[in-house]
Amino acid sequence: MPDQQPAADTHDMSWVLNRLTQEKGVLNAVLLSSDGMVLAQSDTVHRDTAERAAASASSLFGLGRSIAELADAPEGQNTPRRVIIDLPEHCILVFSAGHNTALAVAVAAEMTSPEVAVASGATIKAVNGLAPALSARERTAYRSA
């Protein structure tokens, strides 16, 4: 990824998440790195909650890669595109967002509700339109001199 390209780890992308929370039923949104760090969060979520959610969502994607072996998914094609947590009266949607990132969205509605369908569509639209900007650069190891 070129250094000139705006990325989620160098630019504030909270405006994207705040826009998602304007959809009916959407409570919170968190953009996270593949290693579980918060890159951006909606104004509706407390930082501590965002950090726990980012770590958990990252773990879900890791679990998804591991269990993909069950489907004989080849290496490189084993990263989930989305993970859905279906709770009574709530739903958590976690989407692969860009290079090294995911986007978690909490919706106050049942999985089969119109609110979840709209939230899912809005999230997919944001990801498809902004994937390069929702990406994060590879972390580099720093050696002390």
Regions found by a protein language model. Give the residues of each.
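Acidic, low-complexity cytosolic segments
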Residues: 2-26, 35, 39-145
